[in-house]
Amino acid sequence: FRDRAPRVERIPCAHMGYVGGVFSFSTGEEGEPCDWWRFEDLLIPRTRVESAVGFDRSAVTVTPTTYEDMRPGCYDKPSRLADMDAGRIEAMMCYPSSFPRFCGQTFSETPDKELGLACIEAYNNWMVEEWCADTGGRLIPLMIVPLWDPELAAAEVRRNAARGVRAVTFSEIPAYLGLPSIHTGYWDPFFAACEAADVSVHMHIGSSSKMPSTSADAPPLVASALTFGNAMSSM
């Protein structure tokens, strides 16, 4: 799968916006420099708002960005640990970014499930063996699992728990992803594996891929103010 693996490409961004709880973007030769993650037919841009550290609040906007524009602590482990020292942060849970998305939806939604599973396993291997390794527990690994099959999800929980991972990310509202709700029994193998391995289940706001809003033309502030309502709906 090496030739189909996710990769970063620099492509000008002609448009980027966030209105009515919907994120929109497009490429264009006359646009601003932007780094994009490409995966199969997907192009997902890097944005200032998701790498806001170090910028004045007035500059934290929904605009394109590149890795050179970001503070190195966003992607470089020694720099991250140094930033944590500066901020007096002892440890942090490492959620996925907007490319794999908050519970790994990107890999779970790809039509080729063999490729999706390979990406999930590779992501978890990187998380455990590279990003969080040799940090004295300060960077806490958070695994993702294949959401299309609860038995496969359970197997991935067991695989990572065997090497000390004790946290998994899950969707706040799986029904919004077109998956069975937590009330159906569908997820029982996954939850049973978590319980048996003493793995805690974590849910990031927005992990249902649906952001609340009041109208199609509502400004970003409206969706931001209502975002925490998703957590209230997670049961």
Language-model segment annotations:
Residues F1-M235:
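Helix-coil boundary/capping segments in enzymes
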